[in-house]
């Protein structure tokens, strides 16, 4: 059988992982629970009039176990789960090629862990041809080829016409080995091999669960290797030699049906790997080796089963889920999901506004600022509520710019901007002067002076930074000798002193932000209610009304 391709220099940590390994891992955990000798599915040997059927269980027992242990109340859910497990080849019906489960007395058998899909089996057509050719040599009714198998055999014989003699010789050699096995052992291994091919070469009309979407295969990062890098290289890189490796797998496979429950009674502790050979070994070849190991006593060259098991656990079985390259991809997926969870939680913690509310806020902001936009409301037009001078860019007069200097009054538009925003007040030089006069009367003028000096510090030249830092500290921050100390709390003062250990243009940012918040929340509101601001508004309104009367009289 063609085994999974490995890198030429592959190590134990670089083995391939099937793109569906997470699904297989969950199924195998469930199957291992079913294989438990005490709490698992009851496996028994059924006696008939002339023969025995070893290591089987009924569909009723399986469905009952699923509903009991998985706490399912719906029979259809239990049947669906059983169908999924059977379709992936973890259990099979002993006398039918269709991998389904019925809730009746039909007998089923668990697949040996050696044939589990998590081992990344990729069987070739030559292996399938050997298997079908071997089936034709066995004169038994239950081993006769089905119609679709006979058609497949004819196609394969035509495909491999040049090397069909080699295929026939392999099938004949495997058939001779099978004849030396015990009857019950041969019966179990034949059914397991048939179930393996029912999964990888299913009956026409059934779903092939081993097919992987090429896009999914590419996303999983699984490389595509040439036929030169065979799985035998893995044995050379591991701690077990090639011969000992194949013997250990064969012995482990042969020990499975020797128990009372057959091959299904040994839970899968780790991911087994297929046996290796230079030309590719089929499942029947490994079964033949298993039969030889079972029927004959171990020789001096073959280590005991316990030693083999320990060696496998220390070597080949070390490549479990946690040490394979799939861990990197799984870790990336987990990190992505964790990041998404953090982002979603942050969204839940934020104040969420409805779209209609956001639109209302935008419309309100537009209506508030529209009168100040000269493109939407041209100055001097009928829509201008402030009756300002005409726009100097489209008229032959510059009165709009010279109005305050000529008349000595402040325009209503300018005062309205101060009222709408504290930022607009500070951005206007005349607004800062007016606010400074008010703060001086309130005995808190040092706050605005300190904030403005910090703004100048941020934009000054580099050679002036140490000088300005010293001046600002001596005038506003020094607790012992400051001429105009500002009111900052202890935490801000500690941060500022730490920043002054390495003076730069951002040393006073925390203190400036603190003072800015104080002025915006307290001083600005008192300024709008002060007599200074009210007098300015009253004078501007009188000027506007006088201009309107003159314009009406002139018209």
From Swiss-Prot:
Residues 253-307 are annotated as: Disordered. Expressed in nerve ring and ventral nerve cord. GO terms for molecular function: GTPase activator activity. Disruption phenotype: Impaired egg laying; the few laid eggs are at the post comma stage. Impaired locomotion. The gene is egl-10. SUPFAM superfamilies: Regulator of G-protein signaling, RGS, Transducin (heterotrimeric G protein), gamma chain, Winged helix' DNA-binding domain. One of its GO terms (cellular component) is dendrite. Keywords: Cell projection, Signal transduction inhibitor. Involved in egg-laying and locomotion. May regulate G protein goa-1 signaling. Plays a role in regulating dopamine-mediated locomotion behavior. It comes from the Eukaryota. The keyword Transmembrane helix does not apply. Residues 421-537 form the RGS domain. Residues 37-112 form the DEP domain. GO terms for biological process: feeding behavior; G protein-coupled dopamine receptor signaling pathway; G protein-coupled receptor signaling pathway; intracellular signal transduction; negative regulation of signal transduction; positive regulation of locomotion; regulation of egg-laying behavior; regulation of G protein-coupled receptor signaling pathway. Residues 274-307 have a biased composition (Low complexity). Interacts with gpb-1 and gpb-2. Residues 256-267 have a biased composition (Polar residues). CDD domains: DEP_RGS7-like (cd04450), GGL (cd00068), RGS_R7-like (cd08705). Residues 330-395 form the G protein gamma domain. This is Regulator of G-protein signaling egl-10. It is found in: Cell projection, Dendrite. Its main location: other.
């Amino acid at each position: 059988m063609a085994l999974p391709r490995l890198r030429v220099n592959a190590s134990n940590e670089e083995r391939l992982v099937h793109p569906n390994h997470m699904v297989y891992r969950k199924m195998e955990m469930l199957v291992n629970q079913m294989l438990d000798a005490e709490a698992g599915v009851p496996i028994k040997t059924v006696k008939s009039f002339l023969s025995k059927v070893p290591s089987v269980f009924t569909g009723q027992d399986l469905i009952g176990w699923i509903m009991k242990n998985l706490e399912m109340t719906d029979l259809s859910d239990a049947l669906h789960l059983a169908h999924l497990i059977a379709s992936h080849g973890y259990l099979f019906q002993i006398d039918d090629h269709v991998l389904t489960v019925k809730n009746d007395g039909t007998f089923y058998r668990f697949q040996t862990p050696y044939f589990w899909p998590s081992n990344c089996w990729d069987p070739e057509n030559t292996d399938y041809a050997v298997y079908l050719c071997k089936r034709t040599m066995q004169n038994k009714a239950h081993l006769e080829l089905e119609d679709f198998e006979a058609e497949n055999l004819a196609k394969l014989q035509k495909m491999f016409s040049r090397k069909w003699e080699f295929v026939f010789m392999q099938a004949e050699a495997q058939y001779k080995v099978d004849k030396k096995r015990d009857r019950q052992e041969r019966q179990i291994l034949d059914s397991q091999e048939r179930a393996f091919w029912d999964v990888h070469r299913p009956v026409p009309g059934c779903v092939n669960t081993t097919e992987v979407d090429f896009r999914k295969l590419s996303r999983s990062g699984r490389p595509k290797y040439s036929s030169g890098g065979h799985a035998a290289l893995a044995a050379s890189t591991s701690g077990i030699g090639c011969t000992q490796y194949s013997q250990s797998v064969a012995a482990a496979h042969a020990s499975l049906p020797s128990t009372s429950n057959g091959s299904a009674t040994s839970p899968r502790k780790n991911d087994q790997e297929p046996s290796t050979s230079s030309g590719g070994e089929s499942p029947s070849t490994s079964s033949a080796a298993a039969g030889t190991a079972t029927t004959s006593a171990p020789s001096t060259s073959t280590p005991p089963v316990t030693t083999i098991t320990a060696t496998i656990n220390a070597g080949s079985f070390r490549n479990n889920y946690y040490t394979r390259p799939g861990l990197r991809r799984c870790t990336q997926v987990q990190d992505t999901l964790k990041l998404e969870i953090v982002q979603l939680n942050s969204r839940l913690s934020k104040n969420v506004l409805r779209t209609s509310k956001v639109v209302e806020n935008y419309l309100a902001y537009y209506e508030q600022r529209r009168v100040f936009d000269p493109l939407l409301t041209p100055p001097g037009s009928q829509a201008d509520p402030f009756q300002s001078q005409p726009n100097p860019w489209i008229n032959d007069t510059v009165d709009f710019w010279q109005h305050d200097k000529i008349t000595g009054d402040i325009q209503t538009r300018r005062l309205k901007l101060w009222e709408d925003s504290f930022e607009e007040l500070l951005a206007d030089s005349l607004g800062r002067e007016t606010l400074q006069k008010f703060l001086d009367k309130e005995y808190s003028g040092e706050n605005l002076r300190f904030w403005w000096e910090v703004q100048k510090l941020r934009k000054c030249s580099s050679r002036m930074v140490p000088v300005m830092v010293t001046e600002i500290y001596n005038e506003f921050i020094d607790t012992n000798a400051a001429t105009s100390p500002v009111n900052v709390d202890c935490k801000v003062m500690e941060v500022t002193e730490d920043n002054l250990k390495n003076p730069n243009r951002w040393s006073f940012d925390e203190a400036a932000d603190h003072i800015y918040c104080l002025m915006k929340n307290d001083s600005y509101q008192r300024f709008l209610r002060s007599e200074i601001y009210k007098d300015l508004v009253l004078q501007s309104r009188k000027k506007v009304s006088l201009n309107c009367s003159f314009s009406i009289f002139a018209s």
